[in-house]
Amino acid sequence: MSTRTALKTHNEIRLVFQRMACEIAEAFSDETDLYFVAINARGMAIALELNHELDRIQSNCNVSLGNIHVADDYRWEGVVPNMVALTTPVILIDDVIHSGGTAMQVLVDLYEHGFDTIRTAFLAEREHRNYPIRADFVGVSIATTLQEHVFFSNENPSDLQLYLI
C-alpha cells in the first residue's frame, strides 16, 4: 500500500486559494470578464474556489465557467468556448500539472478557437514535464521523483487535502 504524506493542510490550501485569486485579480485588474476553463472534476473544484475568492476581492469581474472532461470522452460542460468573446482572457485550471500532456491538449483546443489571452493555473506543480507548458498561477511547486504523485482530494469540502503518494 502506498504511503501518503500530507503537503498542505485544509487551512493552508484555503490560504493558497486566496493568494492565487489575488494574483489573478492583480494580473487582470483591468478586465471585467474572465473565462475559467477547468479540466475534469478536480479542476472544476479549484475553479469554483478561485472564483469564490475572486468574488471576495474583485466583485466587478464576471467569471464564466467551463469544464472540459479530457480523460474519457473530451466533452465540454457549462460555458463552451464559442459562447465567449475571443478577447476574454482564458485561465485554464487544473489541480496538478504532471507531464503537461492534458493541459497541452486543452491549450491547443483553446488556441484553435482563437482566444487572444490564455493563462494557466494549477494548485500544485511538479517539475517533470514532457511538454513546454508554463504554470502562470501556482499554488505550490513540489520537487518529486518520477515515481511519486501529487494528489488533491476534495471529497470532503471541509477537509481539503493535498498529499504526496
Model-derived segments and spans:
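Active-site-facing substrate-recognition patch
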Residues: M1-E31
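Short, glycine/charge-rich flexible loops or terminal/linker lids adjacent to PRPP-binding catalytic cores
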Residues: F17, L48-P89, G101-V108, N130-R134
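Short glycine-rich phosphate-binding loop at a beta-alpha junction
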Residues: S29-N40
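Residues at the starts of beta-strands that form the adenosine-phosphate
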Residues: D33-Y35, N62-S64, P89, D116-T120
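Cofactor-binding loop segments of dinucleotide-utilizing enzymes, especially the Rossmann-like FAD-
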Residues: I39, I68-V70, L123-E125
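Generic enzyme active-site microenvironment
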Residues: L92-I93
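Short active-site segment of divalent metal-dependent hydrolases/proteases
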Residues: H98
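PRPP-dependent phosphoribosyltransferase catalytic core
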Residues: V108-I165
